[in-house]
A protein has these predicted regions:
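Ferredoxin-like alpha/beta domains used as RNA- or RNAP-binding modules
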Residues: 1-30, 54-81
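Short, well-ordered loop/turn sites that connect or cap secondary structure elements
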Residues: 33, 42-43, 62
Length: 81
């Protein structure tokens, strides 16, 4: 008997119209922070993951296909058609 397990994608899509978006801007766009200053602190404290790894660079460029995780929620960067 063959068992196939598929990971359910529960990510929240964030559509962008540009080539990339900076991590702190993506956090503001997703309404997970109120200001860039708040995003800066959370990122520098290591509370944000990009593509499954802790990221402390607030200027990190996220492109379509990238994800960031904060407070248990996963946000997927997608390209607006």
């Amino acid at each position: 008997m063959k068992v196939v397990v598929k990971k359910k994608d529960n990510s929240i899509p964030l559509e962008i119209t540009t080539e990339f978006i900076k991590l702190q801007d993506a956090m503001k766009y997703a309404n997970v922070v109120y200001s860039g200053g708040e995003a800066k602190v959370l990122i520098q404290e290591g509370q944000v993951q990009v593509n499954g790894e802790v990221c402390t660079m607030r200027g990190r460029k996220l492109r379509p296909g990238d994800t960031f995780t904060f407070d248990g929620s996963v946000y997927a960067i997608t390209e607006k058609p």
